[in-house]
Design a protein with these regions (language model features):
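P-loop NTPase motor domains
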Residues: 1-74, 89, 151-170
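Structural recognition of the conserved hydrophobic beta-strand(s) that form the central parallel beta-sheet
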Residues: 75-81
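P-loop NTPase motor core of the ASCE superfamily
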Residues: 3, 64-67, 85-170
Length: 170
């Protein structure tokens, strides 16, 4: 019941050891599932696995952790640079399952050619704004106002989010 933290730090320049992170997460989650099952299906203390650079790790059997972990008080927080990383490692279906099991998504900054910005823009939906124009003739000033729908944030607006700012999607 004592709280603790484990940090696994692997050198970025040597990817030959990346498989160890996946093995550790897989084995740790199996052990935590077993402990939860011995204690009525829930861990006494919530366990959270923060997986920075999750998208660069070799794929491992992570889907059960997403789908079965929450009810046992075990959460995996994947931190990725691009949704394309998930699709590359877990395929289209696996990527969708992982995304569907993430209750909250935090986005900050995008590469100029990022398809993730397109996906997020669509996911955020649209809003209705008042748009208008004024034109002036010699004796005929006219004004036109109309309600129109636009994305809440366009892909270009998402790509220009200032450093240190984030979009949180529930």
């Amino acid at each position: 019941s004592e709280k603790s933290a484990i940090f696994l730090i692997l050198p970025e320049e040597d990817t030959t050891k990346n498989f160890m992170a996946g093995l550790m997460i897989q084995n740790l989650s199996r052990e935590l599932f077993a402990v939860a099952d011995e204690n009525g299906g829930k861990l006494q203390n919530r366990a959270v696995l923060y997986c920075d650079e999750f998208g660069t790790m070799p794929p491992f059997d992570v889907l059960p952790l997403f789908s079965a972990g929450r009810s046992r008080r075990l959460t995996l927080v994947p931190i990725i640079q691009s949704l394309a990383q998930l699709e590359k490692n877990y395929g289209k279906e696996g990527s969708e399952i992982i995304q569907d099991n993430c209750q909250d998504t935090i986005f900050g900054g995008f590469a100029p050619n990022s398809q993730t910005a397109e996906v997020l823009s669509k996911a955020l939906g649209n809003r209705t704004v008042l748009s208008g124009s004024v034109s002036r003739g010699k004796n005929d000033p006219s004004q036109s106002l109309q309600m129109m729908e636009r994305p809440l944030l366009t892909p270009d607006e998402l790509k220009s989010i200032p450093k240190g700012s984030f979009i949180v999607q529930k």
